[in-house]
Amino acid sequence: FDEHSFAGNEDSHRVTFAYLFDDKNTKIKSSYGTGFRFPSLYEMFFVYASNSNSIGHVKAENSKSFDVGFEKFLPDLDLNFEANYFNLSYDDVLEGWKTGTSSGSAYTTQNMPGTVKSQGLEFISRWMPNNYIDFDLNYTYTSTYDGAEQDDPDKNSSYTNAQMVRVPRHLINLKTNFSPSNFKNLNFILNT
């Protein structure tokens, strides 16, 4: 339970489940949780307008998440891989908007109407041929839905049901971690 002097009170919960099979190399797992994000000082108080009294009241974003996954380790190959499904939804998302005031327009942060949804699949693999080096290859597919029930103020066009901005549909990560005895750690990471 958290209390915020401007944005109200919020609580969050999480439940998890995991089962390790008898071979000790296979696991299924799942979780469900709720969460929130209080507005930052910038989001609460920044307004670009001729009238500085146009600061709006904002409340916390709320989220619900669910995931289920499968993990397998192949000891003969020193290979670990996972497959996961995730589903998230957000309400009262904090966004910057142009609003009308008695003295004209103002750009400020408001809670967006509608529900923003995100779901996808994640595949993770790690190969550890020895104690000094390992290789990770991850792929994530994300489908998002912008549930706002209003127009984009910058383009005056509807963006309901649109893919979220700055959320890639396809994401691939390649990572190499090298830990020789004379170095603490050396990493190479490639994101596409």
How would you name each of these model-derived features?
Residues 1, 47-56, 66, 103-110, ...:
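Extracytoplasmic loops and strand-loop junctions of Gram-negative outer membrane beta-barrel proteins
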Residues 1-23, 38, 136, 151:
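Signature of Gram-negative outer-membrane beta-barrel scaffolds
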Residues 1-3, 30-34, 43, 70, ...:
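Transmembrane beta-barrel strands of outer-membrane/channel proteins
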Residues 7-13, 41-49, 54, 93-102, ...:
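Outer-membrane beta-barrel translocator domains and adjoining extracellular loop/strand segments
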Residues 9, 19-21, 34, 60, ...:
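Residue-level signature of outer-membrane beta-barrel architecture
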Residues 11-17, 54, 64-68, 119-123, ...:
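Hydrophobic, lipid-facing positions within transmembrane beta-strands of outer-membrane proteins
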Residues 18-22, 27-29, 59-119, 128, ...:
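Membrane-embedded beta-barrel scaffold of Gram-negative outer-membrane proteins
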Residues 86-89, 111-192:
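Gram-negative outer-membrane beta-barrel transporters
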